[in-house]
């Protein structure tokens, strides 16, 4: 199970997060350069708070996001905003790598990481999983030097943690994925059928 394999990195991440929380809280309003799908002019904004090692997040991205995109994003009705809510160190590293890519490659990265979640998270230790993640970065043009620089970039780390802090404070996030539709927290099953009903109410 992914949960068992990442338990150590989760403990380390939680310690890191608590320490960083104090550092980042003073500047927790900076959320520039968000990862988005769709036009800024879209009247309906859907925020997706997710963690790259979360199986439910992977299912949502693979099963629901494409349908929202096809039915509402392409037509200009909806913009999807992807916000990092890492639950462990490996998800945190994946989030860092995401923000080292240009916008075109960011969406591709989301697709790859969620499509291959079972594969890249299947290492027996953190180093092996990290190497798997590095290979994904390499496929998108990130070499080993750039990858290491990315993971040690404090500005990127702060941005991710700030987004997590803001989401926790504003929406009381207690699980992933958490969906926010026009600033209202969506409750219930995150199936396309249920999301569609909420979108249709706003059109």
Describe every region a protein language model picked out.
Residues 86-175, 180-193, 197-203:
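Cysteine-centric redox/oxidoreductase cores and disulfide-bonded domains
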């Amino acid at each position: 199970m992914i949960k068992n394999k990442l338990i150590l990195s989760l403990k380390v991440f939680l310690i890191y997060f608590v320490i960083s929380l104090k550092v980042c809280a003073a500047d927790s309003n900076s959320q520039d350069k968000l990862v988005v799908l769709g036009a800024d002019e879209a009247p309906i904004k859907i925020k997706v708070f997710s963690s790259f090692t979360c199986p439910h997040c992977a299912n949502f991205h693979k099963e629901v996001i494409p349908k929202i995109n096809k039915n509402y994003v392409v037509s200009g009705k909806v913009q999807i905003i992807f916000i990092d809510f890492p639950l462990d160190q490996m998800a945190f590293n994946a989030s860092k790598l995401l923000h080292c890519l240009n916008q075109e490659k960011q969406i591709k990265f989301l697709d790859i990481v969620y499509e291959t979640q079972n594969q890249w998270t299947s290492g027996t230790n953190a180093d092996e999983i990290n190497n798997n993640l590095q290979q994904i970065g390499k496929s998108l043009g990130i070499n080993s030097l750039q990858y290491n620089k990315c993971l040690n970039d404090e500005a990127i780390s702060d941005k991710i943690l700030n987004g997590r802090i803001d989401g926790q404070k504003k929406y009381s996030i207690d699980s992933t994925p958490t969906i926010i539709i026009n600033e209202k927290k969506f409750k219930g099953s995150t199936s396309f059928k249920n999301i569609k009903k909420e979108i249709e109410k706003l059109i």
